């Protein structure tokens, strides 16, 4: 008697793919691998973005520091200090001016001059300026750190384009009457610009504020020293 032998059915390609032996496991492994790869790529991208932001932020901070240092060197004579005014800077909250950045210049431990960073409102927005005063309240120099004034009309506030801002050098509250701290159009002694009166007004206002702030600080210190 011949025994009948049965051969296993051969897949004809019409079976559902997930019913084939081993394909389910292979599919699961692929999905897990792809998910892991995607997660790894996302993590690497996040790290790269974070490092890039940190490097960019540091470059911006360094550039701002260099800008401040360059301006400070223009208004504070090197002979007046042996400290680092940038490193020794501090903020003061003033009732009239708000927050003021103060950069003290010292030589042999003694305060010889002070630079103030003050912001006033011009025609195009804030005008940030440095005003340096010696210990007697005389102006050592005034420079604009940043502004958004109209190009061409307000260029004179930049020392690289005009000597207008040097007109403040050597002045003080003691040497210049209060009513003269204005542009000529307003009865003061400082030139205005053709078509841009608001800009020089803002500069003069900032300088006067710095002078008055130092005067208030000096008066307060003197009162403390004379108290029993």
Swiss-Prot record:
The keyword Cell membrane applies. The keyword Flavoprotein applies. Its cofactor is FMN. Its EC number is 7.-.-.-. InterPro entries: FMN-bd, Ion_transpt_RnfG/RsxG. It is found in: Cell inner membrane. The complex is composed of six subunits: RnfA, RnfB, RnfC, RnfD, RnfE and RnfG. This is Ion-translocating oxidoreductase complex subunit G.
